[in-house]
Amino acid sequence: MRSIRSVATLGALVATAIFGFACGGSTTPAASCSKTYNVGLVTDVGKLSDKSFNANAWQGVQDAVADSSLCIKARVIESNQPTDYQKNMQLFIDQKYDMVVTVGFLLGDDTLAVAKANPTVKFAIVDYAYSAPPPNLTGLIFREDQAGFLAGIVAGKMSKTGSIGGVYGLDIPPVHKYRVGYENGAKYAVSSIKTLGVYQPPSGAKSFNDPDWGKQQATAMFGQGADIVFGAGGNTGNGALLAAVQANKLCVGVDVDQFVSYSDAQKCLVTSAEKHIAFSVKTAITDMVKNTWPSGGLLTFDAKNGGVGISPFHNYDSQVPAAVKTMVADALKKLADGTLQTGYTG
């Protein structure tokens, strides 16, 4: 994963901004750019320092800026609190931006409201889908079941006890897809594997944000014989990863390369089930520039288009057998061409 540029604070604003310029990265558009497109990114309260969704979304914008064929100027505004979301989007609207990218489900309602009020501006939101969005708004979603399936192959093959666990966030579609894929991937690799798993019950402010609960659940699974755990539930899942570190077990991260985003878990992290967020954002920006904006308000990223996968094995690269790496590569190819299914039917 590429490093994220430093952020300069603008004290008079409720947000922080970074400016990037397109057409080969120059500060002025190249002569070949008959039009320059302005793209703004609004983070959730996790900001760019999350090394996760926000940071990866901004990387996708930067990748678009670096592509001289797109002629992009870009700016990011970091939100300090939820009440900033619409205000920050409006800053881009007031400056006549061509496209606004927002990050995550926390911005779902606000993005919809601002998009409806500004039909001539394109909007894309990372990891969120609407049932009937306006034509200028598209959700960027992922086949979590495919990423989970690949991670499950690794977990199944790396387990020495024949038992693996998963600590999940709320039972909502993206999380459910991860679980189904992970468990079925493990069974694809080792038919006799035992899978343990638990969803976090609705917990108000602690939903996806209860590492103590996640740690307790993972510890209980280790007591039942599991020797590797998948933490797929935000900070709740991170608690499961910490339990693995403390119990000297293995773990699998989620969404992004958690070896980079959550260094406390590096000791146990074999890989992460990953959504290629930067790729999805650059794709949406490209669609805006090329006038190939998707109909139906949805862009789906999967194994076929390179939108999901697993992260590098990092410290465990020498411990993952070549045969396992080959199995993962083969499964990825088959998921991409449709000859292998994850078992998710939702």
Residue ranges: model-predicted function:
Residues 1-11:
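Bacterial N-terminal signal peptides that target proteins for export
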Residues 18-22:
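C-terminal motif of bacterial Sec signal peptides marking the signal peptidase cleavage site
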Residues 24-26:
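Bacterial signal peptide processing site
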Residues 29-346:
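A residue-level marker of the well-folded mature domains of exported/periplasmic proteins
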